[in-house]
Amino acid sequence: MSLLVKVCGMTSKEDATMCEQLGVDFLGFIFHPSSPRNVDAAFARSVKTDGAKKVGVFVKQSATEVIETLKNGQLDFAQLHGGQNEEFCKAVGKERVIKVLWPQKYDSVKEFQADIDRFVPHCTYLLFDAGKSGGGHGIAMEFEVFKDVTIPVPWLLAGGLSAENLREALDTAQPNGVDLNSGVESEPGKKERNKLAAAFAAIGQ
């Protein structure tokens, strides 16, 4: 199957349309007030797509709030980006969960593998971000860590990905998909066509 591409931090309908025209599979909408890319459910609902799935990114909300926002924003998936546990995933529903983990926060590969195994039964996708929490900070990670773990569900790689490092990331980590954000922006929340096109060229799609 071809590589899945998610572009996160949608703040305008124009950017969403541009991403779809380029062939993006997932559009990410961030629901986190301290983020420069924060939006509300009404905006997410107003973005109509032609095949791309809409993903809500949640950090501090309760499971009830996540479910309500999924409904009100007409979102397909909840990306749980705040350390939510298995019970939280169950409440939202496995079929709608993209669970985020941060490989760099673990002291050993064994610990990292244990958390992968813990969440696999409760999500449709895993997403691995750089740093030890949060996201959208433009920091990349060491890709070699993925050679030492087994990931039995489709997974996406995030964290400072751009045209400059995408090829290395794909060749080394071999993910099922990538999550682009700050590396394809001219400023926080504003996607840049040239950077997106360069990223797609690097991916080979």
Curated annotation (Swiss-Prot):
<keyword id="KW-0822">Tryptophan biosynthesis</keyword>
<comment type="pathway">
    <text>Amino-acid biosynthesis; L-tryptophan biosynthesis; L-tryptophan from chorismate: step 3/5.</text>
</comment>
<dbReference type="GO" id="GO:0000162">
    <property type="term" value="P:L-tryptophan biosynthetic process"/>
</dbReference>
<dbReference type="InterPro" id="IPR044643">
    <property type="entry name" value="TrpF_fam"/>
</dbReference>
<protein>
    <recommendedName>
        <fullName>N-(5'-phosphoribosyl)anthranilate isomerase</fullName>
        <ecNumber>5.3.1.24</ecNumber>
    </recommendedName>
</protein>
<keyword id="KW-0413">Isomerase</keyword>
<dbReference type="Pfam" id="PF00697">
    <property type="entry name" value="PRAI"/>
</dbReference>
<comment type="similarity">
    <text>Belongs to the TrpF family.</text>
</comment>
<dbReference type="InterPro" id="IPR013785">
    <property type="entry name" value="Aldolase_TIM"/>
</dbReference>
<dbReference type="InterPro" id="IPR001240">
    <property type="entry name" value="PRAI_dom"/>
</dbReference>
<dbReference type="GO" id="GO:0004640">
    <property type="term" value="F:phosphoribosylanthranilate isomerase activity"/>
</dbReference>
<keyword id="KW-0028">Amino-acid biosynthesis</keyword>
<keyword id="KW-0057">Aromatic amino acid biosynthesis</keyword>
<dbReference type="InterPro" id="IPR011060">
    <property type="entry name" value="RibuloseP-bd_barrel"/>
</dbReference>
